[in-house]
UniProtKB/Swiss-Prot annotation:
This is Eukaryotic translation initiation factor 1A. NCBIfam families: eIF-1A (TIGR00523). The keyword Protein biosynthesis applies. InterPro entries: NA-bd_OB-fold (IPR012340), RNA-binding_domain_S1_IF1 (IPR006196), TIF_eIF-1A (IPR001253), TIF_eIF-1A_CS (IPR018104). Residues 15-26 have a biased composition (Basic and acidic residues). Signal peptide: none annotated. GO terms for molecular function: double-stranded RNA binding; protein kinase binding; ribosomal small subunit binding; translation initiation factor activity; translation initiation factor binding. Seems to be required for maximal rate of protein biosynthesis. Enhances ribosome dissociation into subunits and stabilizes the binding of the initiator Met-tRNA(I) to 40 S ribosomal subunits. It comes from Saccharomyces cerevisiae (strain ATCC 204508 / S288c) (Baker's yeast). Present with 35100 molecules/cell in log phase SD medium.
Amino acid sequence: MGKKNTKGGKKGRRGKNDSDGPKRELIYKEEGQEYAQITKMLGNGRVEASCFDGNKRMAHIRGKLRKKVWMGQGDIILVSLRDFQDDQCDVVHKYNLDEARTLKNQGELPENAKINETDNFGFESDEDVNFEFGNADEDDEEGEDEELDIDDI
């Protein structure tokens, strides 16, 4: 029997991120399904999802995905709409970063969809924060090259 290079049992192998396997096939939406982005994690297997048809829905993570596929805020998911409840849906599939980029490039996702490489930690704003680092006191620069004293500040 050969010796493995990993230490420990199943949990030691869990941290290893092997992406050598074949890429999985991209799943497109069908009738009764919609693409969405997770806006808030609610707990108890539920998330608040902002669907790309313009509605915000409470999404239920189905048992096949629960505890196996970890979801976070900003992730792109595929939800199955319910016929009898318009404000609720079921999470069918979670797209990884490369799949979400591919969907956006193929026109499946709208252009204004933000695919987050990093988590936005609950800050959900469409406008960018701009800082101007201009000269606040331009009269100080008019030929005086004196050093600042601590008392002047």
